Amino acid sequence: MKILHTSDWHIGQTFYDYDRTEEHKHFFEQLKKIVREEKPDLLLVSGDLYHTSAPSIAAQELYNESMLGLRDESLAFGGMHIVLIAGNHDSSSKLDVDGLLWKYFNTNVVGTIPRDNDESLENRAFYDSVFAKHIIPVRKNRESEILGYVVAIPHCYPQNFPNINPKDGKQDRMKRFIALLLDKVAEVNTDGLPVILTAHTLVTGSNIKGHDAIIVGGLDNSDIGTFGSGWDYLALGHIHFPQEIKGSNGRARYSGSPIPMNFEEDYDHFVNIVEIEKRGEMPQVRQIPIKSLYEMVTLSAKELPDGKRSCMDLLPLLHNFPPHKKVYIRLEVLETGELPPDYIQRVKTALTGKEARYCLVKQEIPDKPAEGEGLSLTAAQVGALSPREMAEIIAPDLFEEAEEGYAELFDQAVTNVGKQLR
């Protein structure tokens, strides 16, 4: 079985007031080309399809058109199965509703994890519905033979997994839920077909390069042992830096995001091609690079010659910047006082007529003494946060102890307030 693994698309992201639709279209054109050339049996998207739980109409149209385009591309070689799971940025319930239609296109969308008043194992009807939703037989088309199995675990807060054993703490619920699904797969997988587990979560020990440690550090994380051993490849989403997980012998990997989400994500971006012959065999993994339409560029005064490190010394670099080079630009300046009041206007004037997109000035005050042990965020970092991410930093217990659907209600409230303020 050949799998195309990708994640963290973040469709609909606005970056410093710049719309990124063109960049996402550029990615999807590359993805269609990869599908055409690699002819995968399965396209697996491990969460964060959208950047927000209330995506715009334009973002939803781009998602739908791109998904149909990928499916149509696969028809030339007999089709491919598509499996998508919700990430922490997505509306899990909305994805579930959309999935009712997508299933007719050989596509499974797994948004939420079912709950019931009676979650004991004696409730056979409940767990039959759980197995039907989260254990997905992979078929190139709806009439073809089974090639393998996907066990799909969307983003879910620990306390919102089914309470299979009342003695479990909330951190144990996820592990027991996954074990239950893998045991069921082992029962039905009598032909020794490959088993793929996919989840959108933070795995302990992951390289979080590009993510703000303050934000990521406040999220629930799971060690590799949480996922058991009844799978051949663990397809992960959530962390944008592509990597294999330590201790997994190369079987567990983050594909990473296809385009950079911030200036710290100035590394190469990929999708993974994974090939597995049968259950128990080592997966063969290849990374296929994705070319960003706009690169992230930081021009820093630190890199200028001594004696020429003022904010004004960066302006000639902007005047001489290649006119047709598509980049987002961040300036890093070293200043002890306030910037000149017309500095930003000078920056924008220097880039007039160029395709470079100015974003921000990051001001660092040299040798600034520490002001305490509390966490702090720069204005730029605050501006890049969503309201939910900011709330999770300020009041993490609010989300950790909340019932299923609370986060989406919070997002909807933010959206409604935004509409009233327009």
Could you say what each language-model-derived stretch is?
Residues 1-4:
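Extreme N-terminal starter segment of soluble prokaryotic enzymes
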Residues 6-7, 43-48, 81-88, 108-115, ...:
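Active-site neighborhood of phospho(di)ester-bond hydrolases with catalytic His/Asp-centered motifs
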Residues 10-13, 51-54, 85-96, 117-118, ...:
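Active-site environment of divalent metal-dependent phosphoester hydrolases
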Residues 19-128, 227:
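Core catalytic region of metal-dependent phosphoesterases/phosphodiesterases
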Residues 42, 276-422:
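Accessory, non-catalytic peripheral segments of nucleic-acid enzymes
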Residues 103, 203-205, 209-280:
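Conserved beta-sheet core of the metallophosphoesterase superfamily
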Residues 104-218, 255:
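Conserved catalytic scaffold of divalent metal-dependent phosphoesterases
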Residues 121-126, 130-144, 250-323:
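Binuclear metal-dependent phosphoesterase catalytic core
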